Structures are given as structure tokens and as C-alpha cells.
């Protein structure tokens, strides 16, 4: 939810799970990936929210931008170890997680916000396919789903439109 609707515990948990978890996972995986290199690949989960800061999801977007930046940096940093680092960037994945509330002080499901915005849900199977393609492909970031692709185009070619749409 919006930054000011999150209490400190919720904000800390979001950062801990979405960014610190990725950092800790990367650090733990590195020795194993290095031992099986070349051909090793660390796959991170960023988000379409890492393409353009999403109003109402400011802290979530910030953590996913951090994952995107970490992915790019580690891909170069670990090149000498024979480890490739990439990410998938899904938009809204059609899971039970979207049935949950926006935050602790709301009972409004996240799904309602996505539907109201006219955005599409991506089936879980498409995310699995994209993960396979990411690990076996050459792109550093793999967009997943129609909403992610639309967001990438709009963020690149129409950032003013993105700001107006968010209001």
C-alpha cells in the first residue's frame, strides 16, 4: 500500500523479505554456484514495479528496483566466477496472495486494485516458463506478462503519461 499507510513493522518486513532476503540468498548461493561454474545462474525475482515507481506501492517498488540493481551489479561482479545473474520481472501473478489485504489497516483485497486499474493477471505457469527462459537465455531481465511489457514501453516512451495515470 501507500508508504504512509504502512506501519514501521510492515515497512521493515517488506524490505527484509524483498531485498535483504535476495541479498542473503545470493551470498549463501555464491559458493555453490561458483563450485558448479561455468554455466551457473542465479535467478532473482524483481518485478514490473522495478520498471517505473508505482504509486501506492512505493516501498515495494523501491525494493524491486534494488533487486534489479543488485542483479545487474552481480552479473558483472560474478562474471569472473563463471556465474550469470539474471531476473524475472513479472507483473501481477494470479495467486492467492492477491486475495490478501493491501495492508494491516485495510480489508480491501489487492486483487480489487489490479482489476480497477484495468491490468491483467499473469498465470503462474507463464512465470515458470519465463524463469526457465531467463536461466537458459541471454537477457539480464525477462519481462513476464502483458502488463509488464506495457509498463516497460510506457516507462521508456511515455513517462509523463505514467505520472498522470498514477494520479
Protein language model regions, located:
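A short helix-coil junction within the Rossmann-fold of NAD(P)-dependent oxidoreductases
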Residues: 28-39
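Active-site loop immediately N-terminal to the catalytic Tyr-X3-Lys motif
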Residues: 3-4, 54-58
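SDR active-site lid
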Residues: 80-146
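Substrate-binding pocket helix/loop in short-chain dehydrogenase/reductase
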Residues: 2-3, 7-15
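Residue(s) in the substrate-gating loop at a strand-loop-helix junction
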Residues: 47
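Active-site helix of classical SDR
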Residues: 26, 63
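Active-site-adjacent segment of SDR/Rossmann-fold oxidoreductases
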Residues: 52, 73-84
Amino acid at each position: 500500500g501507500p508508504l504512509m499507510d504502512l506501519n514501521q513493522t510492515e515497512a521493515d518486513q517488506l524490505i527484509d523479505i524483498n531485498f535483504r532476503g535476495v541479498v542473503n540468498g545470493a551470498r549463501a548461493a555464491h559458493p555453490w554456484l561458483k563450485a558448479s561454474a561455468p554455466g551457473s545462474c542465479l535467478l532473482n525475482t524483481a518485478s514490473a514495479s522495478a520498471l517505473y515507481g508505482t504509486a501506492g506501492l512505493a516501498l515495494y517498488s523501491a525494493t524491486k528496483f534494488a533487486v534489479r540493481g543488485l542483479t545487474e551489479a552481480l552479473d558483472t561482479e560474478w562474471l569472473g566466477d563463471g556465474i550469470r545473474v539474471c531476473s524475472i520481472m513479472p507483473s501481477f501473478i494470479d495467486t492467492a496472495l492477491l486475495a490478501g489485504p493491501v495492508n494491516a489497516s485495510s480489508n480491501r483485497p489487492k486483487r480489487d486494485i489490479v482489476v480497477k486499474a484495468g491490468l491483467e493477471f499473469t498465470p503462474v505457469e507463464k512465470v515458470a516458463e519465463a524463469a526457465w527462459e531467463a536461466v537458459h537465455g541471454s537477457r539480464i531481465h525477462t519481462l513476464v506478462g502483458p502488463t509488464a511489457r506495457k509498463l516497460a514501453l510506457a516507462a521508456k516512451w511515455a513517462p509523463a503519461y505514467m505520472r498522470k495515470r498514477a494520479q
